[in-house]
């Protein structure tokens, strides 16, 4: 199951990582469930705004930045290419991170995973509860905006927990293959839970995909 999880993560990344290949317009991925499907844990208004407004904004700004970057490349304008890097990183990361995030959630989520992934979690963290506690602490502890992640370290062959600031993508920042991402930007929970991030973590574990 761990192999399937890693391979699945790579497939999820492929469309979003088009920023590294041939220039093409990126499109907003459809959610595999309705906006209201995660209620009462995450309400429909948050899901709609998060997906159709916030993710869409990263996507649109990424397309604009890439178009400008291609123009700068064609002109040989190195100064403009360098100046566009922050926008490409921020908006590209926002698109990649959210594309993964949506697939990590499920109306039928919550509880322990099964098979090889659970065994790997027990091996690397002691138990599922210890893993959950550690990822929760790392996610709650992110200063400002960012993400908490479970990733796979290909070199060491083990699972690792990491945090990334803002929209920095996990693989581009740490080299870890992202398996599970928790968005701790306030737009992910403020309308429902105000600024109480720990309550958001309690809620989101109830809809995190377990298969």
Swiss-Prot record:
The modification N6-acetyllysine is found at residues 68, 75, 114, 122, 130, 202. Gene3D superfamilies: Fe,Mn superoxide dismutase (SOD) domain, Iron/manganese superoxide dismutase, C-terminal domain. The modification 3'-nitrotyrosine is found at residue 58. Keywords: Acetylation, Manganese, Metal-binding, Mitochondrion, Nitration, Oxidoreductase, Transit peptide, Ubl conjugation. GO terms for biological process: cellular response to oxidative stress; regulation of transcription by RNA polymerase II. It is found in: Mitochondrion matrix. Its main location: mitochondrion. One of its GO terms (molecular function) is superoxide dismutase activity. Coiled coil: none annotated. Its cofactor is Mn(2+). Mn(2+) binds at residues 50, 98, 183, 187. The modification N6-succinyllysine is found at residues 68, 75, 122, 130. Residues 1-24 form a transit peptide. Nitrated under oxidative stress. Nitration coupled with oxidation inhibits the catalytic activity. Binds 1 Mn(2+) ion per subunit. It catalyses: 2 superoxide + 2 H(+) = H2O2 + O2. GO terms for cellular component: mitochondrial matrix. Its EC number is 1.15.1.1. Belongs to the iron/manganese superoxide dismutase family. Destroys superoxide anion radicals which are normally produced within the cells and which are toxic to biological systems. Homotetramer. This is Superoxide dismutase [Mn], mitochondrial. The lineage of its organism: Eukaryota, Metazoa, Chordata, Craniata, Vertebrata.
